[in-house]
Amino acid sequence: MTYELEFSEKAWKEWMKLGAVVKEQFKKKLAERLLNPHIPSARLKGLGNAYKIKLQSAGYRLVYRVSNEVLIVTVIAIGKRAGGDVYEAAT
């Protein structure tokens, strides 16, 4: 069962600002998550059905929300880890 991918408007703007290398790294991870989006270790506490993808080498985080009713993974925030701003943007 494969989920579809969507971006919130704000997340799409952030996606378009990313460099090619970071985008490719996120694309690979997102492709895996569309097959299995519910990764217990990536779940974010206090944000409902939200999960994160970490790019440790680049310092970026991507936050997505899973909707099981319609099989959609929605990217809601992308940004640097510093200061936790990406997690605040996801709320």
Where do the protein language model's features map onto the residues?
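Enriched for short, Lys/Arg-rich terminal
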Residues: 2-6, 10-13, 17, 24, ...
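Compact soluble domain cores
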Residues: 21-34
